A protein has these predicted regions:
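Hydrophobic structural segments characteristic of membrane proteins
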Residues: 1-23, 127-130, 134, 140-244
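N-terminal hydrophobic signal-anchor/signal peptide
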Residues: 1-53, 111, 116-119, 244
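Short, glycine-rich, amphipathic interfacial segments at transmembrane boundaries or analogous
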Residues: 14-19, 73-134, 194-212
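Residue-identity detector for glycine
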Residues: 24, 32, 45-47, 66, ...
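A hydrophobic, helix-centered structural microdomain
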Residues: 29-105, 109, 156, 219, ...
Length: 244
């Protein structure tokens, strides 16, 4: 674990100081009369999915335990609404001793606009995903391809840290490289398991385009749009169009 992430690990209830946001950007409370309905859908949806998918999750857990050492569930500190840190859950898809410095450098270069330097001009390289990543286990590749690795985040939804639909929750070190306009995606609404950018292009979307789609969702969000995104997510997952 890097030193830069340690403060967030020690106290996951303390938000980022307001003066940490540059150029006067400040969190704004989420507004809208649909918030209560959205929360109800989150609780009912996440709870129902956990029950329905419990056998699949058990199979995934057994496969992880049988093929590699380490915890079954990967825990990582992410930033939620208003920059508040929380513990984010996924099924572990990497070797337990995997070094995160590779991903850190990739993400920092991506956000800083140095994509060509690391992708050799391939603008369609999967966002946040390193192609043929040697850190990923054989079982992990299947979990990622089918998006099964994301299922533990349903617990985050029940806990109120995430929503079924919303922007992707960033890692703390990513935000250090955000431009001011990028920050809105983590300030105003809860992060989600799926969102507009995931169903629009999944992992093939560029970073700036991802942020634009997140902001578009924030402007236009309503229950009908959430339901549409959820239905499209089912279609995308059934196509196994997840990360490689």
């Amino acid at each position: 674990m890097s030193a830069a992430e340690e403060p967030f690990i020690r106290d996951t209830t303390t938000s980022i100081p307001l003066d940490a946001f540059p150029f006067g950007v400040r969190p704004r409370a989420a507004a809208g009369r649909n918030e209560a309905i959205k929360r109800l859908i989150d609780v009912v949806g996440a709870g129902s999915l956990l029950v329905l998918l419990a056998p699949l999750m058990l199979i995934a857990a057994l496969a992880i335990a049988a093929t590699s050492r380490g915890p079954i569930v990967f825990r990582q500190t992410r930033l939620g609404q208003g920059g508040v840190p929380f513990v984010f859950y996924k099924f572990r898809s990497m070797w337990s001793d995997a070094e995160d410095q590779i991903h850190r450098q990739y993400v920092e270069s991506l956000i800083d606009g140095k994509l060509d330097e690391i992708n050799q001009g391939d603008a369609q390289r999967p966002l946040y995903k390193i192609k043929r990543d040697p850190r990923v286990t054989p079982v992990g590749r299947i979990l990622r391809k089918t998006s099964i690795d994301e299922l533990p985040q349903l617990v985050n939804v029940l806990r109120g840290e995430m929503s079924l639909v919303g922007p992707r929750p960033p890692i703390a070190y990513e935000v250090q490289h955000y431009q001011p306009w990028h920050l809105r995606r983590i300030l105003e609404i809860k992060p989600g398991i799926t969102g507009l950018w995931q169903v629009a292009g999944r992992s093939k979307t560029s970073f700036d385009e991802m942020v634009r789609l997140d902001l578009k969702y924030m402007r236009e969000r309503c229950i009908a749009l959430d339901l549409k995104i959820l239905l499209k997510t089912v279609y995308v997952v059934l196509r196994c169009d997840g990360a490689n």
